[in-house]
A protein has these predicted regions:
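N-terminal binding-site loop/beta-alpha segment at the start of enzyme catalytic domains
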Residues: 1-88, 307
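Beta/alpha (TIM)-barrel catalytic core signal, keyed to glycine-rich beta->alpha loops juxtaposed to Asp/Glu
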Residues: 3-10, 141-308
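Short, well-ordered coil/turn segments that N-cap beta-strands
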Residues: 21-26, 54-57, 83-87, 130-134, ...
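Aromatic/hydrophobic pocket-lining residues that form the small-molecule binding cavity
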Residues: 43, 47, 114-117, 121, ...
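Structural motif corresponding to the early beta-alpha repeats
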Residues: 84-111
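CE4/NodB-like, metal-dependent polysaccharide N-deacetylase domain
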Residues: 116-137, 157-160
């Protein structure tokens, strides 16, 4: 049976930090935009449908789609440039892929030098056809990263008005706090789902809650593994979530999104879909909370054992 969403369904707004950047609580991830086989007009229609649901924040990275995803989004945005001031654009940099589009790259590696951060931003702005990014993230921690150099690059980009807010992705608590002491960070985007619960237990989320900073959560549905396949433990987790969803009369994925957003540091989950119905399911997850019993039932099934 098809789930019917109320016409008034809207994603709420959420501040990443006190007096900081405000995003939609659900963020539309653009990683796979090149796989959606949409024309520029169809991409624009999808963007507009997301925004009608209150999903005004769009997550990119320079490398997505083998360096093509930002350009596909920018091409669509150029058809309706007035939308730019009604949305928030997030992008990432710091990874250099082996790619025919980057013939100068001899090996896949990280680069968090000031020069690369700056050139990546310039390229993202051109591709997205905008004059500023609302949020720039360092994509992954780099063994050669110099916190002072990164902070200096951030400061110069902010002064130039090319990037309004800054953060990181996949950083440990210590790495985050080391850079945050040098330049105020808005968020840490990390993997989090019932099949990847480490941020709850490795102090990543504790540290962010202590600072009053909300993380962003990528792969909230575990890359689709929650829906099919997996071992007996995953199958049991799937059944537990399904039972809760049936009892609450909510879509399966809405329960997962609600579970993620119930963590006290207030994560903002990313979608990865080109189907507006699936975005609506994510937004519905903002409309209810789980009982503690149901929340812990999912955690128990995810970990395969009771809490101590």
């Amino acid at each position: 049976m098809t789930h019917v969403f109320p016409a008034s369904l809207q994603a709420p707004r959420s501040r990443l930090s006190p007096n900081g950047l405000e995003l939609s609580r659900i963020v539309a991830g653009m990683w796979r935009i090149g796989e959606w086989n949409m024309s520029a007009q169809q991409r624009l229609a999808f963007i507009e449908q997301c925004m009608a649901l209150g999903v005004t924040s769009f997550d990119h990275a320079d490398i997505y789609g083998d360096y093509s995803a930002e350009g596909l989004f920018g091409e669509a945005l150029a058809l309706q440039p007035g939308l730019r001031d009604k949305m928030e654009l997030v992008s990432k940099c710091g990874i250099k892929l082996l790619s025919p589009h980057r013939p100068g790259h001899a090996i896949q590696h990280y680069d968090t030098s000031a020069a690369h951060i700056t050139s990546s931003v310039e390229q993202s702005l051109r591709q997205l056809r905008t004059d500023r990014l609302d949020l720039l993230l360092i994509h992954r921690p780099d063994p050669l990263m110099d916190f002072d150099e990164i902070a200096s690059a951030f400061s110069e980009l902010k002064t130039a008005g090319k990037v309004l807010h800054f953060g990181v992705s996949n950083f440990s608590r210590h790495q985050f706090e080391s850079l945050h002491r040098r330049f105020p960070l808005a968020t840490n985007q990390v993997e989090f789902s019932p099949l990847h619960t480490q941020p709850v237990f490795d102090e990543t989320f504790d540290g962010l809650q202590d600072l009053g900073i909300a993380p962003m959560a990528w792969s909230p549905l575990a890359g689709g593994r929650l829906f099919q396949g997996g071992d007996a433990n995953v199958e049991n987790l799937r059944n537990v979530i399904k039972d809760i969803a049936d009892e609450l009369q909510r879509p399966f994925a809405s329960v997962v999104f609600a579970w993620i957003m119930q963590v006290p540091c207030k994560p903002l989950p990313l979608t990865g879909t080109g189907r507006i119905e699936a975005v609506g399911v994510a937004v519905e997850g903002t409309q209810f909370t789980l009982s503690r019993s149901d929340w812990f039932a999912i955690l128990r099934a995810a970990r395969g054992h009771e809490v101590a």
